[in-house]
Amino acid sequence: MARLQDQYREKIAPSLIEKFGYTSPMQVPRITKITLNMGVSEAVADKKVMDNAVSDMTKIAGQKPVVTKAKKAIAGFKIREDLPIGCMVTLRGVQMYEFLDRFVTVALPRVRDFRGISGRAFDGRGNYNIGVKEQIIFPEIEYDKVDALRGLNISITTTAKTDEECKALLTAFRFPFKN
């Protein structure tokens, strides 16, 4: 079992019950999934770019991503229908907690000029989104073998009903919020 999963069961859940006054342990917010999404617009011109993006995402997430394809053609962007334009991976269970642990303790401190993550990236329904500008903050990616710096979006989906509950949950997981 993952370290953060144990921490959630033993410390975080009881503290959230005390803070918000839940009557049932099933009301306590928890993280259900983490989705990593990488848009690769350069894949339109060069197919090898997509292979590199998929290999980077596999190293970061620990499982093979799904290649996302264009739903409809957009002439202005030179995109045809069913053309590969990105990749995504959904993490749940132990892999999710392992990724979260690596992200908070190892990857975030490696961001240049890091002063904390924004406290305004909640969606109003208890979910949180983080944009990462370059994939080299993850220790699994070797700097010398990177062909191009690519960003990715990390969506953390929780069972929290409000942004306040979600922020309390993520703060308990030691997310370094600004202010």
From Swiss-Prot:
GO biological process, one term: translation
Domain of life from the UniProt record: Bacteria
Keywords of the record: Ribonucleoprotein, Ribosomal protein, RNA-binding, rRNA-binding, tRNA-binding
One MF term in the entry's GO annotations: tRNA binding
Listed Pfam families: Ribosomal_L5 (PF00281), Ribosomal_L5_C (PF00673)
Entry-linked InterPro entries: Ribosomal_uL5, Ribosomal_uL5_bac-type, Ribosomal_uL5_C, Ribosomal_uL5_CS, Ribosomal_uL5_dom_sf, Ribosomal_uL5_N
GO annotations of cellular component type: ribonucleoprotein complex; ribosome
UniProt keyword RNA-binding present: yes
Family recorded in the similarity comment: Belongs to the universal ribosomal protein uL5 family.
Subunit structure: Part of the 50S ribosomal subunit; part of the 5S rRNA/L5/L18/L25 subcomplex. Contacts the 5S rRNA and the P site tRNA. Forms a bridge to the 30S subunit in the 70S ribosome.
Role, per record: This is one of the proteins that bind and probably mediate the attachment of the 5S RNA into the large ribosomal subunit, where it forms part of the central protuberance. In the 70S ribosome it contacts protein S13 of the 30S subunit (bridge B1b), connecting the 2 subunits; this bridge is implicated in subunit movement. Contacts the P site tRNA; the 5S rRNA and some of its associated proteins might help stabilize positioning of ribosome-bound tRNAs.
Full protein name: Large ribosomal subunit protein uL5
Organism: Polaromonas sp. (strain JS666 / ATCC BAA-500)
Record gene name: rplE
